[in-house]
């Protein structure tokens, strides 16, 4: 009997709180029907305004190498752009080495990313690996020296660190499209990308401590941010591999799709991004990275703010006054609260 009274009392208190929170004018019948909007209902309203995301097959056009010396084509990568769409795709093309990178690979990747950045028709970039067995297996250990990785007749270097920074600073989203192994330095490459879409055969993990290597930069800090410090320690200290499903659960990737749907789904994400404001996306990427990138991150965010300011009448007044050798008149611009 006492339990029944306590339950009734609790129900009455809950009813009082509920009635207090419901706005005036709501009838009890309407209040009972209030619930969170479902994803499907929100999607329906969105689609009425914007329409469905196109699902037609993308047409890729190969982009020729425009670089140094006698080399007229890329050797270690394939660089393509979608016909009449703002999507670029950069593919590491060393499947015989599980798409491991060497210094030449990194140089070509950086040239392609630079071109995609400078091309105003490109809004999103896909990074992937040739074939279905590996996205990237990291640095090619056969070319590793005491000075880093060295191509024949070249000095050793760790130029992949420059590539990591380039991807982070690039003012357009980069999506890692992962099939097969993303391990070692390849695992770090997908982490520095903005989004990761994985096939159901994808495998993730770090190998460094097994082969006498490590990444104490982005490979540690970004991983800790993505999966938490404890899980990051597990991944580095134990050098275990994780399935795509496990990676999704720990927040390491965004989604998992069947292997046969990988490119289709990735292109769909690209098309959704391309619907949105490129300036908003640019500044958001800089802001999201700034917290982890210290002064360099703040510099990137500040640079974006400067570019936006250059497009205002206030900035134009300052430049025009200087060019005309007169004092600027900033009094006509509001000092917003």
Swiss-Prot record:
Q: What is the lineage of its organism?
A: Eukaryota, Viridiplantae, Streptophyta, Embryophyta, Tracheophyta
Chemical reaction(s) catalysed: 2-succinylbenzoyl-CoA + H(+) = 1,4-dihydroxy-2-naphthoyl-CoA + H2O
Q: What does this protein do?
A: Involved in the biosynthesis of phylloquinone (vitamin K1). Converts o-succinylbenzoyl-CoA (OSB-CoA) to 1,4-dihydroxy-2-naphthoyl-CoA (DHNA-CoA).
**What keywords are assigned to this protein?**
Isomerase, Lyase, Peroxisome
Cofactor names from the entry are:
hydrogencarbonate
Quote the record's binding site residues for hydrogencarbonate. Answer: 206-208
One annotated GO molecular function is:
isomerase activity
Protein name, entry field: 1,4-dihydroxy-2-naphthoyl-CoA synthase, peroxisomal
GO BP? menaquinone biosynthetic process; phylloquinone biosynthetic process
Q: How does it assemble?
A: Homohexamer.
């Amino acid at each position: 009997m006492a339990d029944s009274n306590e339950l009734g009392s609790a129900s009455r208190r809950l009813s009082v709180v509920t009635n207090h929170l419901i706005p005036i004018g709501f009838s009890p019948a309407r209040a009972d029907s209030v619930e969170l909007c479902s994803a499907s209902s929100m999607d329906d309203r969105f689609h009425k305004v914007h329409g469905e995301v196109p699902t037609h097959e993308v047409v890729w056009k190969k982009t020729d190498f425009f670089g140094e010396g006698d080399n007229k084509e890329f050797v270690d990568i394939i660089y393509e752009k979608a016909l009449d769409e703002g999507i670029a795709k950069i593919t590491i093309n060393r499947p015989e080495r599980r798409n491991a990178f060497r210094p030449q690979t990194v140089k070509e990747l950086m040239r392609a990313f630079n071109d995609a950045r400078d091309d105003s028709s490109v809004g999103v970039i896909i990074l992937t690996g040739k074939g279905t067995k590996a996205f990237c297996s990291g640095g090619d250990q056969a070319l590793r020296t005491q000075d880093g990785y060295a191509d024949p007749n070249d000095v050793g270097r760790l130029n992949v660190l420059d590539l990591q920074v380039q991807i982070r600073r690039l003012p357009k989203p980069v999506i890692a499209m992962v099939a097969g192994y993303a391990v070692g330095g390849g695992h770090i490459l997908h982490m520095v990308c903005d989004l990761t879409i994985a096939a159901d055969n994808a495998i993730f993990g770090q190998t460094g401590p097994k082969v006498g290597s490590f990444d104490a930069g982005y490979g540690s800090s970004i991983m800790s941010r993505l999966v938490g410090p404890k899980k990051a320690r597990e991944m580095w200290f134990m050098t275990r591999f994780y399935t795509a499903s496990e990676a999704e659960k720990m927040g390491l990737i965004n989604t998992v799709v069947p292997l046969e749907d990988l490119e289709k789904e990735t292109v769909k994400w690209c098309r959704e991004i391309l619907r949105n404001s490129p300036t908003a996306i640019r500044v958001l990427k800089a802001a999201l990275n700034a917290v982890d990138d210290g002064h360099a991150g703040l510099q990137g965010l500040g640079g974006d703010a400067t570019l936006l300011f250059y497009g205002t009448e206030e900035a134009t007044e300052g430049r025009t006054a200087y060019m005309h050798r007169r004092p600027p008149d900033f009094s006509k611009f509001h000092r917003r609260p």
